[in-house]
Every structure is written in C-alpha cells, then in structure tokens.
Amino acid sequence: MAQSGSGHMTRREALELIGMSAATASMFPTQAFAQGPTFPKGAVIRTLFKDYAPEELAGGATLFHEHMSLAPDFMDRFRAATAAVRAAQGLPPAAARAGGPPNPAPGADPMRDVTLMTQELAKAKNQGVACIVDAGHPDMGRDLNFVREAAMKSGVPVVACAGFYSQPYYPKEISTMSEEQITQALIKQVDDAPAGAFGEIGSWDEITSDERKVFRAIGKAHVATSLPIFTHTGIPGKSAIEQLDLLEDAGVKPEHVAIGHLGNLVDPNVYVHKTICRRGAFIGFDRQGGNGDAQQVPMVMALIEAGFADHLLFSADAFNDYAKTLTVFLPKLKAAGANEDVLHRITVDNPRRFLAFVPKRPRRRTS
C-alpha cells in the first residue's frame, strides 16, 4: 500500500490495512489517533503470521485476553478446581463469573468449529476490533492449528501465547522440573508458535510452590525474549500483589506486566488496583459484557478519575461475541461519564503499548 508523502501511515491507510470501515472506526476519534503513543525503535506486536509495527494496529481496539481454543473439559476442570480451593478456605461457592458468555448450546461451540470461529473473528473485526490475543497455551488444551486457520481465514491479526496456566492444569513433570528447565520449555513454546506474549499465567489465591516456580521461570523467559506477561488471578484476586512481586524479583519491569481479572477484586476504593498501577504495571478488567459490569464500571471510573487510565486493559475473556467490550461495556462507561479520548487510550493505545516489544530473538518462519 502506498503511504502518505510524509512517510507516515495515515489514519485512512491504517484502517484499510486492517480492513475496517470508516463507519466502524468512528468510535476512535481522529484527534486521539493522531496523538497516539510512541514506541521504542524496533518494537513489534508479534502475531501468528507477521510482526506488526504497533502503528499498524492503531485503527481499532486490541483485546488482550480472549480464547479461541481450549480443551473440551477445560471449564469442568476449572469449576472443580475453584470449588476445591474455596472449600479448603472455608468459603462458599463462587458466584457466576463476572463476564464472558454462557456455555454454548450443543453443536454451536465456536471453539470446535473453525467456520464458526472464523465468523466470530470477522464479526469482531467489523465491530471495531483490530487485533485479538488468544490467551491459551498447551496445558489449557489450545489447538494452535485451529487458531491459525481461523486467523488466516478471517484476516484478523491474532497474537498467540506461551506459558503454563496454573496448578490444576500443569503437566505432571512441572513438580520435578527446575526453574531453568521450565524457562527453556517456555522459550521453545515462544519459538514454535511463534508467541507474542506469555499468558495467561495463573495462580489461585493461595499461590502454590509450583506456581511460584513457574512465575519465576516466566520472569526468566521474559528476560530472554522481552515478551509481555499477563496473569490470571482467582476470585477475589488476593494473589495480585504477590504475582507482581514474583515477576519483579525475577527481573521483569512492571510496565511489561498486566495483572489480570481484577474486576473480580471488588473494592470501591480500588486500593490494590492503585497500588499495582503506581508500581507501573497494567491491570486487566477482562471479564466484560456480563453480569459483573455493574461492579466493574465504578471501579474503572475511580481509576480513571485518579489518573490511572494509562494502566487499564479491557477484554471479555470470551470465546464468542468478542467485541462485547466495545458494544456492551464501553457504552456503560460513557453513561458513567468516560469520554471518547480516554476510552480510545484504554482500548487502542494501552494494549499496543503493553504488547509491543523489541525482540531479542529472531522470529521463526511461520509454516
């Protein structure tokens, strides 16, 4: 595509590059686009099929935590693990999750039908999504070939991830592997995908010794690759600070970390949220468009009003209707007083700043 005479991509050219209509893009103001963030020289956002300059994805939202492929029994195992942890802590059963879709009807699961998944991605693109991060990895049952096919057919840039999820999902050998062995396994995942982030990297609210070991290895793998890291915290997110501590102790700068699922940590004063932001990390409100929006909106507004908008990341943690962050959650924030400029920063600029990294290792050719 020919670029403008200045050598910089125009707004219209960027929209055409990702196939987005001007009408859809009207939710992203031109002024905010023109005043977008700056990135380090050589920074890229690594998707399955190419490395993008961050500026190339400025024409729409990037969703930093979604799912396109998980094992068929993933949610059953998740519910069982959650129930066991809460029972051990003397807590009542967890309430319904704060966002994301209900279980699909039999025969209508996009994660089992590449045609349906391609349609979901194409719909999200038409609704203003420029890029999606698939937050799965091998121990979650992600089928990378499935993700590749849906990304290719839909034309949506998809970031694949590397990692180990949490104790109930770890391969048995994790308990006997050294941190260095886990680090090397993670780097191999990065090269093989190729991956553009480590995530989601999880723990339950009482972090196990194996989970601490994995977090330290993730930190070492980041130092070797520069890939950003996003995490999974349990309900209500008591492990958030310790997760950041573990990663920082391993040599990770906070600006390369997003502590996830903090919409579940309900606190009108957003004390933990502010603490993490002050340390320089991002925080994820990433289960949007569901029954938890009512608790998330006032917390997001409190953080915006406190000056922490540049530390917020939004997503739905969904496997369909990916654009619900834009179509359902953002209107609620607008009704609460958020303006277009700040919403552009959160949905377009922040995830690009988070995902952009300067590679330390060459990208392997995608087959």
Region locations from a protein language model:
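N-terminal secretory signal peptides
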Residues: 1-10
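N-terminal export leaders
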Residues: 10-28
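C-terminal segment of N-terminal export signals and the immediately downstream linker at the start
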Residues: 28-55, 367
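Divalent metal-coordination and catalytic microenvironments
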Residues: 65, 132, 222, 283, ...
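Active-site gating loops and adjacent loop-to-helix segments of metal-dependent hydrolytic enzymes
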Residues: 67-114, 161-180, 318-330
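Active-site gating/metal-coordination segments in enzymes
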Residues: 130-131, 149-153, 157-228, 279-282, ...
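Distinct, well-ordered alpha-helical segments
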Residues: 145-148, 172-173, 208-213, 236-251, ...
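Short acidic/histidine-rich active-site segments
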Residues: 232, 286-288, 309-323
